[in-house]
Amino acid sequence: MDELRDIRTTGPEDVLNSVDPYRYTSQIPNGKSNNGLNAKMNGNNTLTNMINRSIAKNMGQNASSGSMRRSMRQSLRNSLPRSSIGPQQQQQMNSTQNSTYHNTARDPRPLRDKNFQNLLQQEIFSYLTDQKFDVETNHPISLKSLKQPTQKDFIYMFKWLYLRLDPGYVFTKSLEHEVYSILRTIHYPYLATINKSQISAVGGSNWPKFVGMLHWLVIINKKLDECLEHLDVSINNQVTQDITVLNQPLKTAEEQEKKQEKYELMVERLFIDYITESYKSFLRLEDDYEPYLHDLELSFQRFVHIIETDIAQLTSTTEHLSVECESIVAKNYELKNIKEKNTGLEQEYKRLSHGVQITQAKSKEWPDKLKEIEDEIDKKKRDIRQVSLQIDELTSVLKRKNISGEEIEHKNKESDSISKSLDTVSSRLDQFTGLVRQQRLETESVYKNLQDTLKQYKSATEGLVIARKNLGDHIDESSIELVLPSDLMSEEMIGLTVEELIGDKKSFTDPIKKNLNKIAEDIKMRITNIQTENSKLQIKLEDLRNEITTKNEDLDQLEQQLSSIKSEYEEYRQESQSQLLSQNIKIEKLERKIQNARVESQQKISSIEREAEETRLKLEELKLLQNRERLELHNKVIQLIEYVSNFKINTQSSIEELQNATQKELQRLQTEV
């Protein structure tokens, strides 16, 4: 986990520089291996490292979640170099493991219990089914395969479970040695209950032990899957932190450009991850690219969510800024009004200041003016005194002439009345003069309007005559012509009526009106005929429109058919290209498989020939040994026959001697009795 933390805190270039290239091989040490297979594996590992370095250079400091996930999985699964364990260390490890196995040789699980076996088998079957064991291995699996297994079923299950723990491992030895060495390397706690002879025949009474071993591998795989899932979650959290950084508000155009560059880098990462995973799958001769495409779609959905969030944030920011802009505009308008008022007040202040200055300047002149006014008042007082003296003198003169003041006042009143009547007459004369002038102006305006009307009438009649002439109807222009006298505004023409003005020969009611009515009726008839023709043309126009509509519909249908045919052709072309590409890929894979099979067959043929030669030599040695042993057996048989014959002869002689002794003893006893 410390290694994972270091990987998360450093950039992809530092990680790739610090990674041991041997970690991308198997962590299980091999004593002997095929040189050709090792060279092939080293070539694949070199290619993988080159791809990883290329991805790291393109990604910069922010490595994508997919590549980090893959590198971390490889770091977890391939944490030990293949060549890191030497023979002495292997022997020490084996001795340590053997001591451990001897200490924990007893398996506490009730593997002989049928119910417990069913539980283990069901759990193993569920895990294999969930992880698509049958799809990956192309080997069917069922509960019957776990209850009554074959050697092939066990091999497929064991290889698949172990390769999930160590994807870089290559099975090269025989199954008995391979399984036993793998279990010893991964510290299977109950290895002492299994021996190599049992591995060569897993069925029968030994099967519960192997069910327990497979269940232990399933548990280890589940724990590893949980750890990797937790690691994926932590990496996704790191991606979420990048998303949070992208969702921060922007303040400058430079930040917007940086965010745009991050968006482009994210899209490049997504495609690079997809292409890299697909290429690795292609190198593994796998045709299923759907998981990588699904990951690409999910990544693009997250990317679209980021874009939508950014757009929503920019929209809200724009709305907020628009509200602020409106408030600023309103404040600016108020500020403008305030500035205008301030300008007006400043002008008023300047005007008042100027007035005050003028007043202050004039206030300096007031004492002189007051002095002049006082002098003027004194002068007027003196004049009044002189006038009063003159009045007194005139009064004394009138008394001497016997003229009273009442007569003077009466004469003044008469003079006033005469002046008033004169003023009244002059005012009435002015009124009459204004009325005459006004009437003359009105008459002139009426005369001008009449002349304008006559001009309009004349232009209208001329247009009517020309129009009727174009239609073939000749009208006498003099019959509808009106002419006014030239001296209409003279004083002799004042007070004439309309009939007197125009004359007895011409009247509005008789010939002109009749002619105009006749022309109007003719025009109405022509309008009616034109309307009927227009209605017919309208019907034809509607028919043409309907026909155009039907033609347009037919044209749209043909265009739709053309577009559908084009789309079908394009789909067929793309499908053909994809099929051709897939066929080429299959051909390349088959050629690669054929070449690999050819190489393997050559290797197998050479190994079989070598084994046949060794077997022939062994057969000859065995024949010689058989002949030698046959001679030895013949000698032994002859010796045994001789021994048996001698033993028989000796036995018979002993029996005869015993019989003779017995008879003698019997005779002796008989004689004594």
From Swiss-Prot:
InterPro entries in the record: DUF5595, Kinetochore_Ndc80, Ndc80_CH, Ndc80_sf
Entry function: Acts as a component of the essential kinetochore-associated NDC80 complex, which is required for chromosome segregation and spindle checkpoint activity.
Location within or outside the cell: Nucleus; Chromosome, Centromere, Kinetochore
Organism lineage string: Eukaryota, Fungi, Dikarya, Ascomycota, Saccharomycotina
Region annotated Disordered, chain positions: 1-39, 60-111
A Gene Ontology molecular function term of the record: microtubule binding
Name of the gene: NDC80
Compositionally skewed regions (Polar residues) per UniProt: 24-33
Comp. bias intervals (Low complexity): 64-80, 88-100
Protein name, per record: Probable kinetochore protein NDC80
Record GO biological process: cell division; mitotic sister chromatid biorientation
The keyword Protein transport belongs to this UniProt entry's keyword annotation: no
The entry's keywords: Cell cycle, Cell division, Centromere, Chromosome, Coiled coil, Kinetochore, Mitosis, Nucleus
